[in-house]
Amino acid sequence: MNRWARWPLIILIGILGISAVVILSSLASVDYLINIWWFDSLGYGLYYWLRLLYRYIVFGAVTLLFFLIFFLNFWVASRYVGNVPPAPSKFRIAALDRYLNVVRMFRSGSLWVYTPLSLILAVIIALPIFEKWEAFLLYVAGPKTGVPDPVYGKDISYYLFSYPIYTLVQRRLLIAFVLLLVGLVALYLLERRLLARQEQPIPAGARLHLSILILLIFLIETWDYVLQRYELLYSEAHMPLFYGGGFVEMYVIWALIWLTLFFLMGTAFSMIAFIQTRKGLKPLVVFAVGFVLVLGLRYSAFLPATVEKLVVKPNEVSRERDFIVNNIKATLSAYNLNTVQTRDFTPARTAADVASPKVKAQLRNIPVWDGELLDDVYKQLQQLRTYYTFPSVDVARYTVNGMPQQVFLSVRELDYTLIPEAARNWVNEHLSYTHGYGAVMTPASQGGDEPMTWFIKGIPPESEYGFRIEQPGVYIGLGSYTYVIAPNDAGEIDYPKGNSNTMVSYKAEDGVPLSSFLRRILFAYHFGDRNLLFTTKTTPDSKILFRRNLLERIRVLTPFLLLDGDPYAVVTPGKLYWIQDAYTTSEFYPGATPTLWGRDRFNYIRNSVKIVVDAFSGKVEYYVFEPGDPIVRAYSRIYPGVFRNADQMPPELKAQVRYPQDIFEIQMNIYAKYQQTDPEVYYQQEDMWEPAKTFQDRTPVTIKPYYVTLDLIDPSRFDFLLLAPMSPKGRDNLRALALAGSDPPHYGKIIVYNFPKGELIYGPSQIYALINQDTRISEQFTLWDQVGSQVARGKMIILPISNMILYIQPVYLKSATKLKIPELKRIIMSQGQIVVMEPSLEEAYAKLQERIKLEIDRVDKRFAPLLPGSPAGR
């Protein structure tokens, strides 16, 4: 094998060697080793290696591509340097020696110069692509959706997976070839200046090389203009009316893009012809001038503004109709709202009998407790030790005594910061106080002046209603947890018992074994804690448990999933579990209006994944609940074995799955505008909605979706569902009630009950004002305040019961002393202008029923038809 034939092999081996060194040095770092051990302890060792491998495969492949682009072009250019030697008669001996040295440097030494230079440039160009390595995987693995976009007819998967990669690659290729062209032109000019050969023409091969590069640059720029056609689908020029391309974009800008392409290609071929033949300057000038003029029109605001003013504005509805329709359809599809079912709801004048079995069933599950106030009750009555806390209160439904019952549930977690200062030491923090214990559960519905009913209470957990938790330890939760070592010789405090503590030794899958002194050294370095290295309280079975916060654990495992803000606990006969909803999102759904949610911006979202985390062992499992979502299908292909089908979820967990509040809130914010599917109605925005508002402590607040158990989906059964009251934009009355089912077979089904447009349905803020105006209620509040109690009004909920719209607000009393245990005292219930306040839901409903009948009788008597013969009847 000659010297030149060996060079490609040497270069390839060199690149692979450098990549191997980078990978091995990364793996040798402490963080990588700890991650490998941690992922492996959870059963995701192969998945972690795949993520590492994919990352470096993408980086290596892209770097190699750009390296070859740079190196081969530099190498070809070096062949033409000195290809035409200078005439000896015109040069001194010194000049000839200089010429030969330069030629030798660029030819023989070029491999030593161009190889590192090409590698450096390739890495610089490839780095932004490396940061998007997972998008490349989605591009490769993304499936077809079978849904074309209405403008270009391309499958939606093109926009979700291909378009973002094409735009990124196009920009990097353009930068690479422009740098290359500048470098090669400089190289050829350098040769001519060093050798004083300006009178000699550039070699034909060099001209051909430069011509090809120029053509490639023009082709890459042409690709950019082709991609700009699709970019029009993401135009924000017409916001806030509609999103995406409008008349100006799809007719004027679209035509200018094609004209730009025409003149660009004409300029490219004219320039190459001129470089090769020194002829054809006139066509080059014509095409170049045309390109500049059209480009100016393309990016100038003059022509679009003129067309908008003279053509579009006078007939805006007709001109923009098709584009408004495209935006409506795309947005509803992107947010999974294209299958929303609408129903009419006409409120009845009279209330059904409170003795009716159906009314009783509806009242038994109305959540009258406010989660925030209930949290104070749990902490005061069930915290039991200073170091326990209840981070959040969840809404759920369970079967109690054979009947479906909506409940509130909270996990008793450990909070080390609550331990007295004198007891805070390394042993207690990392060896003894390792976990929380058990949970509490109460019914959502309860009467005032009644003692709290506890479905689950105490330590150890006990229940008179059939609930049991065999393993109540909580090592994974919502709190901020430090690392712990378990089991250990110091002993873990399992739960308090009398004046002492019951001890336990941890036995579960979670945790990285501290099986060697080297591991202790590495973990001590990682956590910056030398006590971990020198402690004598470990055993051969000791493991180190870290990343015990639920959200942190999931985000480290699957950073590509967007997490819901409300993970919730599940009680099973065996253990406590957490269920975390996760979303797949994209900001490239064509023509769909984007949403800003926290720091995330997207215009496509699916609640594709339910994540189950064992609160004791820390085991994490992923279940796909949206198998039609192309993004989660792509991830399932990329990471085989990570995602499971929903039917593989254990029945006791699947029974507790619920439709998440965050995505429903996002959907309703979108639907409030895009339920106007008629383009003319949409253009006028005459029926735009917004979430209903009320007052909380005299502060206006938006009512967020809340969970209730009602028969609104199927009249023959009660479903656990989310309810969101909607009002007309800028108004206080109600316009609709939107709901989303959580129980199979109606899971995820969204139904919107529309109220008659011509009928006033009171909104929650109006009911709030009516309550304040009720003299009997105000007098009672004043009386309670005078006896040293504080009156607290809970969140108002709106419920359709027996064809009536009821407004329910609980009233609590809190002691004015430091020890504040909220007590549910009364239930305020209203139907329109009639407001009552009674100790229980049943009593309030009965009282409301009585008041409604009296009001109907009063109105009927006052406006009864006059008797024949009366003075007014003559």
Curated annotation (Swiss-Prot):
Matches recorded under Pfam families: UPF0182 (PF03699)
Entry's localization field: Cell membrane
First-listed, main subcellular location of the protein, grouped into a coarse class: membrane
Swiss-Prot/TrEMBL keywords: Cell membrane, Membrane, Transmembrane, Transmembrane helix
Record membrane topology: Multi-pass membrane protein
Record-linked InterPro entries: UPF0182
Domain of life: Bacteria
TM annotation in the entry: 7-27, 57-77, 110-130, 171-191, 208-228, 252-272, 283-303
One annotated Gene Ontology cellular component of this protein: extracellular region
Matching HAMAP family: UPF0182 (MF_01600)
Family: Belongs to the UPF0182 family.
Protein name in UniProt: UPF0182 protein Sfum_2137
Naturally occurring in which organism (per UniProt): Syntrophobacter fumaroxidans (strain DSM 10017 / MPOB)
